[in-house]
Amino acid sequence: MPTRVFSQEPDLVAALPRLLQHARRFFAADLNVLGSSPPDRASPQEGYVGLRWESARYPGQGTFRVTSRAANDDDRFAAEAAEARGRAGGMSELAARCACVWTITTEGEATGTAELQLSALLASVALGPVLPEDGSTLYGVRGAMERAEKAAQS
């Protein structure tokens, strides 16, 4: 399963201005929007954005598709299991408060820690935890950036 970011923000497309602002202000990154669902779609919870990420802080760049959908029981069970595996106390409760899940898919090649950094950016706007594709734990913005920093130093 791809990396999931639990989101309290109900509309990924409407969150684009904040994502762009946070990328520059807090992540020293260039984020370019390559495409998105129309803003006036029938279900705001369902949508996508195509993004190009390039970081100045830690090595990493890539093109990604982020899709949004309603969170379901499988997502919540996966969050509970990851919390137990990773000893991430309280993070599954935060995930349970999130009505949406944003899924990150790499399109083409991503280098360095681009996906980790993008997941941190998304979590900063979504106000929910990140569930990495290996399901090993749950973490927030700080946890994602700590992993990116550690990977950049190795």
Residue ranges, per PLM feature:
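Acidic (Asp/Glu-rich) sequence patches and key acidic residues
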Residues: 1-154
